Amino acid sequence: MNIILTNPRGFCAGVKRAILIVENALKVYKKTIYIRHELVHNQYVINTLRQKGVVFVEKIEQIPDYSVVIFSAHGVSKKVVQEAVKKKLIILDATCPLVEKVHIEVSKSSEKAIETILIGHRGHPEVEGTIGQYNNKNGKIYLVESIEDVHNLSVQNSKKLNFFTQTTLSITNTKKIIAALKNKFPEISGPNKEDICYATTNRQIAVRQLSKIADIIFVIGSNNSSNSNRLAELGKETGTFTKLISSFLDIKKKWLKNVNYIGITAGASAPEILVTEVIQYLRKIGAHKPIEMIGVREKKIFKIPKKLLNIKTILDENG
């Protein structure tokens, strides 16, 4: 059996930044660090942070006054921020800058009372945070998940309408939904390029290339990871047998019967150690040394926000 690794795979710049913020906060603050929701959707990462003393909560009311709170990489609504301020919490925002970019645009639409359509998955924390940027009672924000939703959608003023997207969607499906929106609402405005992030795009392109070679594809990521699920869906759409696994423990040997090429990728919130463990397991049962595919080299780095520079400065001074 041959192992083929996609490039790029695993952590994106937004996830790396979020984890760095938490690790820095743990070194600087001599009190419990609370994180609202899972920092990123990967159980290995969450368990690792828990072992370091981090406490995860779903509601701000669960956090004692004057504590340190970190908002997850998915972002939060304006209401959540207000709740944190009311409790006089020390706020560290780990929202991905690409998600924050969408927040800013939705806020602008809200300020102008321009009706707004968000393409995304209902219940996902990023979607809830983005919808929560729109608070103008004279306007409205709508969520669509499919072309059918577009067909059933009614707005108050189709001549003054904006759309935005969740950052971790399927490229192909999103383009179809946008086309349906533009067909139904010819005067709708949106970003020149959909808001799907570079990392999501790069990983989906890599999986499509991988599917031309692999007999089976393992997507390493947690079940609640949107971008990991999209990678698994894409693999299946190409006709390649594809499985979303959280670790090597999920692999069943029967899947590998008569398999020559095993493809491996990892969602943007999955650490490389999980990839390494999968490779080690496959090597033990007879697979050859992995081959790396040539792919896009991601150079993007998201800096820590100015309000957190004091953390970095303290760390630098302490060596």
UniProtKB/Swiss-Prot annotation:
Residues bound to [4Fe-4S] cluster: 12, 96, 197
Q: Could you read off the lineage of the organism from its UniProt record? A: Bacteria, Pseudomonadati, Pseudomonadota, Gammaproteobacteria, Enterobacterales
> Which residues does the annotation say bind (2E)-4-hydroxy-3-methylbut-2-enyl diphosphate?
41, 74, 124, 167, 225-227, 269
Q: What is this protein called?
A: 4-hydroxy-3-methylbut-2-enyl diphosphate reductase
* Cofactors that this protein relies on: [4Fe-4S] cluster
Quaternary form?
Answer: Homodimer.
Q: In which pathway does it act?
A: Isoprenoid biosynthesis; dimethylallyl diphosphate biosynthesis; dimethylallyl diphosphate from (2E)-4-hydroxy-3-methylbutenyl diphosphate: step 1/1; Isoprenoid biosynthesis; isopentenyl diphosphate biosynthesis via DXP pathway; isopentenyl diphosphate from 1-deoxy-D-xylulose 5-phosphate: step 6/6
Assigned EC number: 1.17.7.4
Q: Does the keyword Acetylation apply?
A: no
Organism from which the protein derives? Buchnera aphidicola subsp. Acyrthosiphon pisum (strain APS) (Acyrthosiphon pisum symbiotic bacterium)
